[in-house]
């Protein structure tokens, strides 16, 4: 299948005003939307047909041109182009702004890109943009320098004149005062009058002095400010700025608002700035260097791309197509509209008002205010609520801006691009279908008819049951009888996909061959329930139909349920008989020596079955039976004198003979009693030894026999079955005494409350265990509850203990254990107080489940995101590196046995180097597949450790290689090229996360049940590379430890071997120290009990150790919960966490200091530099949490659709990033085939052509149909039936015009 629409890169950049105008089909000038009388869009408004295209297909607005024949004509009356109405989904308009505005993403984002570029604090930038301060945009340094002496002289002259004027005015007042006083003296005035005259004169003089001094000060201020004025200075004092402009306006320019920013950007010299910053980075220290690094990133982004910084200030605003911001009429004649229309309307209104004010020549203050309002309107259109209070609609709801359309789960990325609705799908309740084969599902007839409708219609026409598609459609809609036969034929061998939400791993969607069933419920095979985590208490499932031949082939070959018997997480079987089937098979293989027919001899199996039917032989009675086709096994060796092909006389039960008949003919004889464990091993063994077809057939046999004998066994549960013969009171009495003694000691004050609690808990735990053991022993072997639990069919001993023995200790709402046990069992009944204590745990269990399910789902999402581009890209990267893995360890008797974790560490890998025996012989060559057989041989030969290939050491530049990944756990074969191993890893780690979380709930909150609280949060802490709480220190160097214990504190002192300064580690008093005083410790030793910080491990021991540490820690959590996950899945994620390097010194490479770069790019740049004899860069490994690593990916599409959408897009657009489209998400977003599986080029370039034979056999019997009756269709035929006539039978000889 070829893909012609392939393109290699997707670039994002800053749109300039020219770009916006070029995209636009016209300017939106009016804020109107539609005419409420005619319901037609207003001209030049937000829905204008002239700009955005016609609202009806092939019809202009005024109705002059209608029909497709006028295609492409532009109507001269209304100006609308005659075309399809769907162009209203992609035609944009624009608003021509009367004043420039800044793009809020670049000014208000964190960090402020505009602020970094112009070296302005965001606060200052805000002042300029929102008209609170002036910004100097240019200074004519030359002219100022030239005229400075003259200006200085002029200033001096002016100040002198002012001072002289002041002095002369004061002198005049003083002279007048003298005259007045002389006059008063002569008139013989009183002293009071003289004082009054003097005071008045003093006041006048003070006023003159104050006024003159203020003017002088202002002049001095203006002069000083002007003398030192430089570009980018801010002036918040309007009066001062105006005075300076009036006096020295010809030497500088300044302005407010986005205009000022725009002018600065137009004259900004990026080259010079970059040089200056690089110099600062080389010479600077601390804060200055850090800021310079951050600024250099922004400056460099514009230097290395075609982006112009002027794109951060807009002269025109794009108007998105009207179909993406629709307006719909509601029932009551009212209209519902998208919030964007309101936001656009505010922008247009303010813009038009500003234009009018400018035309009128309004005062500057009014114009500036309108410009500020326009800036705010555009801000809220782009990102409402980013600055100040958000614009709200009715009911104080913030309006959804363009940014909000992209963000979050309901945003464009996650809602529409990554999660689309699917055609050809249905949904219904599921019921069990025990009669189905493993690869089948039951599809309700009506649903199948709707799903396969087009296929059925085509086939009806092919078979001449209908003359054309229209009549075929009518037949289908009326459920004519022939339709069902055609449907039956069409669905043969056409697989359908079944999916159950939540789809936690890939087994949540599987393909089945549909079988038509009556009713309306889907029927599901019992063995696939565990893969889907489905039960039949009302669960629903969705059906999807693969349409193209390629899709059908993939569904059949890769997704068919009989091909998905193994779990991708650990390679263990997932389709294992459960519940009823286990009980049935367990009943079949039980041995009861004292039953009828024990010790009898039967020559053949048939004879034994006849005796069983006649009641002479019990199913479980041991007898000697002659078995045909016997295959000896370790447990049941061949009888003496027996040779292959003969009937073997075996001491067994009829049940076991019947059980062995279910297995493949050449399978060794099984003599064990069937339990959940033995059946699991059996299925694993079958999957390993036999082709999938045989395994699937055997599983179906086991299922059928299990249900049959389960019914036959008559296992039921009644309250009378809860009869355990043991003396509970006697056991409890002893422990009651112990508890009382502890309580008395506490009452006397001999022990503290903590000790009392822990001792009581200890006592009651022992009591509970003893009661449980006694109860278990007291249950009769054939007791149905005992059989259910011991066979693994349902329940566990913990539940039985609570029903028949003792409920035990429970936890309180805080999660602490209450030291008073619930002594009753459910069989005896709880007292009121006991019931009350028990409710806490049960409620907490339910609440926890809900919370943790959400957390676990979020963890899976982050894991998928970080690893989605890890795909097997090549067969072999050629590396010789690998990991050393322990495969054997001595047991208690000193014998060498396989290591308990060998299944999850060494199994399914590839050897990195030869394994040699003690005598030097090569036991296994490098490149060999490590399977169960090889591990067994190596352990037998005494090998304890092997070196295997690992994803962690893979050298593929993109993704990983098949050899380093090893076997695919789900198929048991080497991973294919194109396998999306990253996503499989994420699912394998995330899916049990949810299961663990959901398990708290079944135990009803019993204290001994391991709550996952250590589980999930610990996993998140590790994958997010967070520093744990109460972090345990590790030794940074090798040396000797001394413990210094003073009254106030405890310190560990480490004296390094190399004689350097000793290092002190303060520790808490209650901490458990893991090293002894005076002990010599190697580097990286953990000194105190607790959690180690992975970042410290990386710093001290390097990346390899950090990788191992993370893998081991994650595995510890899962193993403590009894969940098996293969190491390779964790390794895939950990590799992604350590992919990046921070550049410290850039050397002579094109890397920037402080830049986070991919390891492959770093190595390539250094190799190139060394090859040319230049200085290579130096860097340090960076451990990133999965969220941070996802956001740091090369793909901006993937990062934007993950989290922090606006921040990612802002940064990507500024850097003009190109998305290489290597991952899965980016390709889903742009609608290309994903580059995994058959979507890889090596497969898509393959062309598939059916052979002639295949074409002929497409439908086995073209006319294999009975004749159907259509009563009363054509009475003139003289009969009541009408037959479809094959086209070949028509006489084509005559001319139809005759």
Curated annotation (Swiss-Prot):
Its cofactor is Mg(2+); Zn(2+). Gene3D superfamilies: 1.10.132.30, 1.10.150.390, 1.10.1790.20, 1.10.40.90, 2.40.40.20, 2.40.50.100, RNA polymerase II, clamp domain, RNA polymerase Rpb1, domain 3. Mg(2+) binds at residues 535, 537, 539. The keyword Transcription applies. Zn(2+) 1 binds at residues 60, 62, 75, 78. Keywords: DNA-directed RNA polymerase, Magnesium, Metal-binding, Nucleotidyltransferase, Transcription, Transferase, Zinc. GO terms for cellular component: DNA-directed RNA polymerase complex. Zn(2+) 2 binds at residues 877, 954, 961, 964. Its EC number is 2.7.7.6. GO terms for biological process: DNA-templated transcription. Transmembrane segments: none annotated. CDD domains: RNAP_beta'_C (cd02655), RNAP_beta'_N (cd01609). It catalyses: RNA(n) + a ribonucleoside 5'-triphosphate = RNA(n+1) + diphosphate. It is an enzyme of class 2 (transferase). DNA-dependent RNA polymerase catalyzes the transcription of DNA into RNA using the four ribonucleoside triphosphates as substrates. The RNAP catalytic core consists of 2 alpha, 1 beta, 1 beta' and 1 omega subunit. When a sigma factor is associated with the core the holoenzyme is formed, which can initiate transcription. Belongs to the RNA polymerase beta' chain family. This is DNA-directed RNA polymerase subunit beta'. It comes from Micrococcus luteus (strain ATCC 4698 / DSM 20030 / JCM 1464 / CCM 169 / CCUG 5858 / IAM 1056 / NBRC 3333 / NCIMB 9278 / NCTC 2665 / VKM Ac-2230) (Micrococcus lysodeikticus). The lineage of its organism: Bacteria, Bacillati, Actinomycetota, Actinomycetes, Micrococcales. The gene is rpoC.
């Amino acid at each position: 299948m070829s893909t012609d629409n392939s393109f290699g890169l997707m670039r994002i950049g800053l749109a300039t005003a020219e770009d916006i105008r070029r995209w636009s089909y016209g300017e939106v000038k009016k804020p109107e939307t539609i005419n409420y009388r005619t319901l037609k869009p207003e001209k030049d408004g937000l829905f204008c047909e002239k700009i955005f295209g016609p609202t009806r297909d092939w019809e202009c607005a005024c109705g002059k041109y209608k029909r497709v024949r006028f295609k492409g004509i532009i109507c001269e009356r209304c100006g609308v182009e005659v075309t399809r109405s769907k162009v209203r989904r992609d035609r944009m308009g624009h608003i021509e702004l009367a004043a420039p505005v800044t793009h809020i993403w670049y000014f208000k984002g964190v960090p402020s890109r505009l602020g970094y570029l112009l070296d302005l604090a965001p606060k200052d930038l805000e002042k300029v943009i929102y008209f609170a301060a002036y910004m100097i945009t240019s200074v004519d340094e030359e002219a100022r320098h030239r005229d400075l002496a003259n200006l200085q002289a002029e200033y001096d002259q002016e100040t002198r004149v002012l001072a002289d004027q002041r002095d002369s005015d004061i002198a005049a007042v003083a002279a007048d005062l003298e005259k007045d006083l002389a006059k008063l003296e002569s008139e013989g005035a009183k002293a009071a009058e003289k004082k009054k005259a003097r005071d008045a004169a003093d006041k006048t003089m003070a006023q003159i002095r104050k006024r003159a001094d203020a003017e002088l000060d202002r002049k001095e201020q203006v002069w000083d400010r002007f003398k030192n004025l430089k570009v980018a200075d801010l002036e918040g004092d309007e009066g001062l700025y105006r005075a300076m402009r009036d006096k020295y306006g010809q030497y500088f320019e300044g302005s407010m608002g986005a205009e000022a920013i725009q002018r600065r950007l137009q004259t900004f010299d990026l080259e010079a700035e970059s040089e200056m910053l690089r110099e600062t980075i080389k010479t600077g220290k601390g804060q200055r260097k850090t800021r310079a690094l951050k600024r250099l990133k922004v400056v460099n982004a514009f230097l290395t791309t075609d982006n112009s910084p002027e794109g951060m200030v807009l002269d025109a605003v794009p108007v998105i197509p009207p179909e993406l911001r629709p307006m719909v009429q509601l029932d009551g004649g009212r209209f519902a509209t998208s919030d964007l229309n309101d936001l656009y309307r505010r922008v247009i209104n303010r813009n038009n008002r500003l234009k009018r004010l400018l035309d009128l020549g309004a005062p500057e203050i009014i114009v500036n205010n309108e410009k500020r309002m326009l800036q705010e309107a555009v801000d809220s259109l782009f990102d409402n609520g980013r600055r100040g209070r958000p614009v709200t609609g009715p009911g104080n709801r913030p309006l959804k801006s363009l940014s909000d359309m992209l963000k979050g789960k309901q945003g464009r990325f996650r809602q529409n691009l990554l999660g689309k609705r699917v055609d050809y799908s249905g949904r219904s309740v599921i019921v069990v279908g025990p009669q189905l084969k493993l690869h089948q599902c039951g599809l309700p007839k009506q649903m199948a008819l709707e799903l396969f409708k087009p296929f059925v219609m085509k086939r009806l026409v092919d078979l001449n049951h209908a003359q054309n598609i229209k009549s075929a459609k009518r037949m289908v809609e009326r459920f004519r009888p022939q339709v069902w036969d055609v449907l039956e034929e069409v669905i043969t061998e056409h697989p359908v996909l079944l999916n159950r939400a939540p789809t936690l791993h890939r087994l949540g969607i599987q393909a089945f061959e549909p079988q038509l069933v009556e009713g309306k419920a889907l029927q599901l095979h019992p063995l696939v329930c565990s893969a889907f985590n489905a039960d039949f208490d009302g669960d629903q499932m969705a059906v999807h139909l693969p349409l193209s031949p390629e899709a059908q082939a993939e569904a059949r070959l890769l997704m068919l349920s009989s091909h998905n018997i193994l779990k991708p997480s650990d390679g263990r079987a997932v389709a294992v008989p459960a519940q009823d089937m286990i009980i049935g098979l367990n009943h079949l293989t039980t041995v009861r020596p004292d039953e009828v027919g024990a010790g009898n001899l039967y020559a053949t199996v048939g004879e034994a079955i006849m005796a069983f039917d006649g009641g002479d032989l019990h199913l479980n009675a041991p007898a000697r039976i002659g078995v045909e086709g016997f295959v000896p096994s370790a447990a049941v060796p061949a009888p003496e004198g027996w040779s292959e092909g003969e009937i073997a006389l075996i001491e067994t039960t009829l049940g076991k003979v019947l059980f062995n008949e279910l297995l493949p003919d050449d399978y060794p004889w099984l003599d064990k009693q069937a339990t959940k464990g033995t059946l699991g091993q059996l299925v694993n063994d079958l999957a390993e030894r036999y082709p999938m077809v045989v395994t699937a057939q055997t599983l179906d046999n086991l299922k059928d026999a299990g249900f049959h004998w389960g019914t036959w066994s008559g296992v039921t549960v009644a309250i009378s079955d809860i009869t355990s013969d043991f003396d509970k009171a006697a056991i409890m009495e002893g422990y009651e005494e112990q508890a009382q003694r502890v309580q008395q000691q506490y009452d006397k004050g001999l022990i503290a409350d903590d000790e009392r609690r822990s001792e009581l808990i200890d006592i009651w735990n022992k009591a509970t265990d003893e009661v449980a053991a006694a109860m278990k022993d007291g249950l009769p072997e054939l007791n149905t509850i005992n059989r259910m639990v011991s066979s693994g069919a349902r329940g566990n001993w913990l539940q039985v203990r609570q029903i028949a023995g003792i409920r035990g200790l429970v936890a309180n709402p805080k999660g602490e254990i209450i030291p008073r046990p619930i002594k009753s069992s459910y069989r005896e009944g709880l007292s009121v107080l006991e019931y009350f204590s028990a409710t806490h745990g049960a409620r907490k269990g339910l609440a926890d489940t809900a919370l943790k399910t959400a957390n676990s789902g979020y963890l899976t999402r982050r894991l998928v995101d970080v690893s989605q581009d890890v795909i097997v890209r090549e067969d072999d990267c050629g590396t010789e590196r690998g990991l050393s893995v322990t495969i054997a360890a001595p047991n208690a008797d000193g014998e060498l046995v396989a290591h308990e974790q060998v299944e999850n560490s060494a199994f399914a890998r590839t050897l990195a180097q030869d394994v040699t025996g003690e005598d030097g012989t090569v036991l296994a060559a490098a490149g060999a597949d490590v399977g169960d057989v090889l591990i067994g041989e190596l352990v037998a030969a005494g090998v304890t450790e092997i070196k295997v290939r690992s994803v962690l050491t893979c050298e593929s530049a993109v993704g990983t290689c098949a050899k380093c990944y090893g076997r695919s756990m789900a198929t048991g074969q080497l991973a294919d090229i194109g396998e999306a191993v990253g996503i499989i890893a994420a699912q394998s780690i995330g899916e049990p996360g949810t299961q663990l979380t959901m398990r708290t709930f079944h135990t009803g909150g019993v204290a001994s049940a391991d709550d996952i609280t250590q589980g999930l949060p610990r996993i998140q802490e590790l994958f997010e590379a967070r520093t744990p709480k109460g972090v345990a220190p590790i030794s940074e160097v090798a040396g000797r430890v001394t413990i210094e214990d003073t009254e106030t504190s405890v310190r560990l002192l480490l004296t390094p071997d190399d004689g350097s300064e000793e290092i002190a580690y303060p520790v808490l008093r209650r901490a458990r120290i893991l090293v002894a005083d005076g002990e010599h410790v190697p580097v990286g030793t953990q000194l105190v009990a607790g959690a180690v910080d992975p970042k410290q491990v990386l710093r001290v021991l390097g990346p390899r150790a950090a990788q191992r540490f993370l893998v081991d820690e994650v595995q510890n959590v899962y193993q403590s919960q009894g969940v098996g996950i293969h190491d390779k899945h964790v390794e895939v994620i950990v590799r992604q966490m350590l992919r990046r390097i921070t550049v410290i010194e850039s050397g002579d490479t094109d890397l920037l200091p402080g830049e986070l770069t991919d390891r492959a790019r770093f190595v390539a740049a250094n190799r190139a530099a060394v090859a040319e004899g230049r200085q290579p860069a130096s860097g340090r490994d960076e451990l990133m949490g999965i969220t941070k690593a996802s956001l740091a990916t090369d793909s901006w599409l993937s990062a934007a659709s993950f989290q922090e959408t606006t921040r990612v897009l802002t940064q990507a657009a500024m850097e003009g990033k190109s998305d290489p489209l290597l991952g899965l998400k980016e390709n889903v977003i742009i609608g290309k085939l994903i580059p995994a599986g058959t979507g890889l080029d090596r497969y898509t370039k393959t062309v598939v052509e059916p052979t002639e034979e295949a074409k002929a056999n497409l439908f086995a019997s073209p006319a294999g149909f009975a004749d159907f009756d259509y009563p009363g269709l054509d009475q003139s035929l003289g009969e009541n039936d009408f037959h479809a006539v094959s086209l070949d039978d028509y006489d084509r000889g005559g001319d139809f015009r005759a």
